[in-house]
Regions:
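Polar/charged low-complexity regulatory segments
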Residues: 11-18, 22-229, 233-235, 239-242, ...
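Short, strongly hydrophobic alpha-helical membrane anchors
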Residues: 1-9
Length: 364
């Protein structure tokens, strides 16, 4: 009897184990076929490994994989210019993303002081879908997120610090140094180490081969137009007063007009520097080129907005209110003697005003 029970128990166990094994195999096979069981893609997988500005996406991080941003710019910082590149971009009207939005008659642009002041930031206001000739933001929430994500700007202090940093030396200082190194490298016929990063070599070779006129490009427009965009954003978010924003834009206009001879020249300098900064090749570069070609058409083409704004138009003289705010928000960084010798007029004037404020504070 005991033997019969053991035999029946063994048989029942064998049947149960067989059924269990079958169920496990079925569940495993179903899990592999069921798309709902797949791991949800990361945001990077959803966007693709590299974002390209076919129309400038809301999250265009271009070459960045980790979240590294151009904080208050530190001159010569390697990671800032290799993995911390940021172009401030935003979504726009999907029907025609390059259709300028103008408040009031277009004929008023030629005499509008506000349009004159806002003009340098129009390269980005065009992308945001904002009115080009009027203060204000069409997507304050999106701008706030972008500033935090791409610039580490979260308040008045971090905003003013970054604007001052771009006015002080920005990326142009780095690119001027890189150009000199590239040309020295070519002149000495130095052999490049095989392990030298491809992206670095691409930058150097573009200078050496004078691609797109890099050997004579003035990179100032890249810094000033981005600073204008941050200024407009700061005013729209309440981190700068209207008076501070207008005065900072007056300084930016002064810098552009004492550096270039026309809107077209300034626009081309911005686009070439942006191309250098993106450091792309192949299809990605072609997509970016198409984007900037359309941007250029909207600004300086036959019906471009900048053509309606006189290059030699009147705008207020800068009072350097940004520097007045430095006491509570950031530290002034005067030029060295060597920097002064090579600096353009508008940068020397900015430096003079910085020294005045430093002296006043020391005398308190």
């Amino acid at each position: 009897m005991i033997e019969n029970l053991l035999s029946k128990f063994s048989y029942d166990m064998w049947v149960a184990l067989t059924i269990l094994a079958g169920l496990l195999a079925w569940a495993f096979a179903k899990g592999r076929k069921d798309p709902r069981s797949k791991k949800a893609p990361t945001s990077r997988e959803q966007r693709g490994t590299t974002q390209r500005p076919s129309g400038e996406s809301p999250h265009e991080e271009t070459d960045s994989s980790p979240k590294k941003k151009p904080r208050a710019i530190q001159k010569g910082s390697a990671d800032e210019f290799t993995s911390a590149k940021r172009d401030i971009v935003a979504s726009r009207e999907t029907s025609d993303p390059f259709r300028p939005r103008i408040k009031g008659p277009h004929s008023d642009l030629s005499s509008s002081v506000e349009a004159q002041l806002l003009a340098p930031g129009m390269v980005y206001a065009l992308a945001y879908g904002d009115f080009l000739n009027s203060f204000g933001l069409s997507n304050s929430r999106g701008i706030t997120k972008m500033l935090k994500r791409d610039w580490d700007i979260t308040d008045r202090s971090t905003l003013l610090r970054q604007i001052y940093s771009m006015l002080r030396d920005g990326h142009r200082s780095y690119y001027n140094d890189l150009r000199k190194k590239a040309l020295d490298l070519a002149a000495s016929q130095t052999r490049v180490n095989p392990g030298f990063p491809k992206s670095h070599w691409r930058e150097l070779s573009r200078f050496i081969n004078d691609e797109r006129g890099l050997q004579t490009t003035n990179f100032t427009a890249w810094d000033l137009m981005r600073a204008a965009n941050l200024t407009r954003a700061g005013e729209g978010l309440g981190w700068m007063t209207r008076d501070e924003a207008e005065d900072t834009l007056a300084l930016i206009n002064h810098g552009l007009r004492t550096t270039y001879s026309s809107w077209e020249e300034a626009c081309d300098a911005f686009i070439v520097t942006r191309w250098l900064w993106l450091n792309e090749e192949g299809e990605a570069m072609e997509a970016s080129d198409l984007h900037d070609q359309r941007r250029r058409e909207a600004l300086v083409g036959p019906n471009g907005v900048w053509n309606k704004i006189p290059w030699d138009g009147t705008y207020p003289s800068p009072r350097y209110l940004l520097l007045d705010a430095s006491d509570e928000n950031f530290q002034l960084n005067p030029m060295s003697r060597f920097e002064w010798e090579d600096a353009p007029r508008w940068e020397r004037e900015l430096d003079d005003e910085s020294h005045k404020r430093i002296q006043e504070r020391n005398e308190r």
